[in-house]
């Protein structure tokens, strides 16, 4: 019933990057503009370096007054053009990067909503949030921000090298002997960054998951005095994250020092060869200054090109995590049988379902029929398979064997959207979204429901008595996860949502298990208004609430061990009678 989420299989950096660049295609005009501007910016840098010769020779050696007058103007114009080009590059690249991050978030979010329910059992939500958050940002950095640095610095290095070749090819070729060593260093740095980046991403997800678990359960943590234990666990994860981060810093520090050392060797070689050229009369002071300033421009450029490998490799690691989601198979949805409104005939035929890694099945050879308009109660001890059974009907999970039929057709024969339109669900844990009461009741495909139907649904769910007392009525905000409302109020809004949907199949998953007596009475009254003329499946904890069910299925260890009406099962004196007797004695006590 579930699938495992494995670490993405390693693929080549170029293959991942090429796939990533496909997301940049819609912004190619922006990127072309950025490239042209980057070329102009690099040309501006090279032009400034070229001016070092007339500045030195004409101003300080030959005392040329005319050159001294126009050089400052040239420098100002050069930097104005360079500044405008740099601004265009930054804006175009920035817009592209942020747009790619947005597109990735939307695409991955849409993909998550198409994945089977088993995915949400095997991947924690904090891991999903990491993918939608920092992973998307780092991918955008790899796709565009890193490219910006690489283009800018590469063009500046190429421009400076070209200028050096123009002024002295002998000096330049002497320095280029060091290029293979530099390429080897950059390759080693890239490999190490990529290896560490995968671990850092996983460590960040584990940190977020641990914080989510602890903070979401803060009451339990405090009442059981688990603050120290949880802090030790979180601290251990934070320390691991720190160790990985320090590996990145160590790699950056070593690579920077190595590049600087190679640069120093190159600079020393330049001084030695240039000195010999000058003594031979083949190099002027201006030529030497151009060579020196060009070399001083190349060294920080090479340093940035080495350091950008961290950004690239972290982005590629994030891209692989995102692509592993995008490459996951969607929920199977090949149904073609048309379905407008079902009659509500539900049939299970020898259904078996199993969680991965489990020897015993969650459900084993389950068979029953729920006739249209009837109430089928499903009872049993915790872990007996009740929730697993009802999750198969809307195909949140798929059965391993057997068939589930709706109106005589396997549920797989219908399109998922059509199948789920036939089902309303009211669970024990009601999820409300941070919006108004009206938004939460008229939810999803019901968002355009007219005001009259909306009010009738809220009235029918016994919710109007508290909604009317709120300052903004139906437009009152419920807070995050409905935190401004009580449990009973949230439950009644869930019933109103189900009433507004008016689906032929109703699933109630322990809808009153966690309520006080008064709230339970109001909710039960609302449910009695909701259930007529629908096929209703009720998972019941309190057996007193299902005494009038048309049939009761008693489950134990994934099997239906008893079935019949409430009175028939009491007369049998089996498991149902035992559970009923226990609850009766508890109420008397």
Curated annotation (Swiss-Prot):
Which keywords appear in this protein's UniProt record, sorted alphabetically? ATP-binding, Cell inner membrane, Cell membrane, Lipid transport, Membrane, Nucleotide-binding, Translocase, Transmembrane, Transmembrane helix, Transport
GO molecular-function terms, A-Z: ABC-type oligopeptide transporter activity; ATP binding; ATP hydrolysis activity; ATPase-coupled lipid transmembrane transporter activity
Q: Which domain of life is it from?
A: Bacteria
Does Transferase show up as a keyword for this record? Answer: no
Domain ABC transmembrane type-1, first and last residues per copy: 32-314
Q: How does it sit in the membrane?
A: Multi-pass membrane protein
Q: What is its EC number?
A: 7.5.2.6
- A Pfam family this protein belongs to? ABC_membrane
Cellular localization per UniProt: Cell inner membrane
**Which residues does the annotation say bind ATP?**
380-387
What positions does the domain ABC transporter occupy? Answer: 346-582
Q: Where are the transmembrane segments?
A: 29-49, 70-90, 157-177, 261-281, 283-303
Catalysis performed (reactions): ATP + H2O + lipid A-core oligosaccharideSide 1 = ADP + phosphate + lipid A-core oligosaccharideSide 2
* Calcium found in the keyword field: no
Q: Which SMART domains match?
A: AAA
This entry carries the following GO cellular component terms, namely: plasma membrane
Gene3D superfamilies associated with the record? ABC transporter type 1, transmembrane domain (1.20.1560.10), P-loop containing nucleotide triphosphate hydrolases (3.40.50.300)
Q: Which family does it belong to?
A: Belongs to the ABC transporter superfamily. Lipid exporter (TC 3.A.1.106) family.
Q: How does it assemble?
A: Homodimer.
What the entry says about domains is: In MsbA the ATP-binding domain (NBD) and the transmembrane domain (TMD) are fused.
Q: What is this protein called?
A: ATP-dependent lipid A-core flippase
């Amino acid at each position: 019933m579930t699938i495992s989420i494995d670490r993405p299989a390693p693929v080549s950096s170029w293959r991942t990057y090429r796939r990533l660049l496909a997301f940049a295609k819609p912004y190619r005009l922006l990127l072309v503009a950025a490239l042209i501007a980057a070329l102009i910016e690099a040309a501006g840098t090279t032009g400034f370096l070229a001016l070092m010769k007339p500045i030195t020779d004409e101003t300080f050696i030959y005392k040329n007054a005319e050159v001294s007058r126009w050089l400052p103007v040239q420098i100002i114009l050069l930097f104005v053009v360079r500044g405008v080009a740099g601004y265009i590059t930054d804006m175009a690249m920035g817009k592209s990067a942020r747009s790619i991050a947005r597109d990735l978030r939307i695409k991955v979010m849409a993909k998550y909503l198409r994945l089977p329910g088993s995915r949400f059992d095997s991947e924690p939500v904090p891991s999903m949030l990491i993918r939608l958050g920092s992973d998307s940002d780092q991918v955008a950095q790899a796709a565009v921000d890193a490219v910006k640095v690489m283009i800018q610095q590469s063009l500046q290095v190429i421009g400076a090298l070209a200028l050096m070749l123009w002024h002295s090819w002998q000096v330049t070729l002497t320095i280029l002997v060091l290029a293979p060593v530099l390429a080897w260093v950059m390759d080693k740095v890239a490999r190490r960054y990529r290896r560490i980046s995968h671990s850092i991403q996983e460590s960040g997800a584990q940190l977020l998951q641990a914080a989510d678990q602890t903070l979401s359960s803060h009451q339990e943590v405090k009442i059981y005095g688990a603050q120290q234990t949880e802090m030790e666990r979180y601290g251990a994860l934070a320390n691991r994250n720190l160790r990985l981060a320090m590996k990145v810093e160590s790699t950056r520090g070593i690579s920077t020092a190595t590049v600087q050392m190679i640069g120093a060797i190159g600079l020393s070689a330049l001084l030695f060869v240039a000195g010999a050229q000058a003594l031979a009369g083949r190099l002027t002071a201006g030529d030497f200054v151009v060579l020196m300033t060009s070399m001083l421009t190349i060294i920080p450029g090479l340093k940035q090109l080495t350091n950008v490998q961290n950004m690239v490799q972290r982005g590629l690691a994030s891209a692989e995590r995102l692509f592993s989601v995008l490459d996951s198979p969607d929920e199977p949805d090949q149904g073609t049988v048309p379905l407008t409104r079902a009659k509500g005939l539900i049939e299970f035929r020898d259904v078996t379902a199993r969680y991965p890694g489990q020897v015993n099945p969650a459900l084993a050879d389950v068979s029953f029929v729920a006739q249209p308009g009837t109430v089928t109660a499903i009872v049993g001890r915790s872990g007996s398979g009740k929730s697993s059974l009802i999750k198969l009907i809307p195909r949140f999970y798929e059965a391993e064997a057997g068939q589930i039929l709706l109106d005589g057709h396997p549920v797989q024969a219908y399109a998922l959207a059509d199948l789920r339109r036939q089902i309303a669900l009211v669970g024990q844990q009601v999820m409300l979204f941070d919006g108004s009461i009206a938004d939460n009741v008229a939810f999803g495909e019901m968002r355009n429901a007219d005001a009259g139907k909306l009010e009738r649904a809220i009235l029918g769910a016994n919710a109007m008595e508290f909604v009317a007392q709120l300052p903004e009525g139906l437009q009152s905000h419920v807070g995050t996860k409905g935190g401004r409302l009580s449990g009973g109020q949230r439950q009644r809004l869930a019933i109103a949502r189900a009433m507004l949907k008016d689906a032929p199949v109703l699933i109630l998953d322990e809808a009153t298990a966690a309520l006080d007596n008064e709230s339970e009475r109001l909710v039960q009254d609302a449910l009695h208004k909701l259930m007529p003329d629908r096929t209703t499946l009720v998972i019941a904890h309190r057996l007193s609430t299902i005494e009038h069910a048309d049939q009761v299925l008693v489950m134990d260890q994934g099997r239906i061990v008893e079935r019949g009406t409430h009175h028939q099962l009491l007369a049998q004196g089996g498991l149902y009678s035992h559970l009923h007797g226990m609850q009766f004695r508890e109420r008397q006590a």
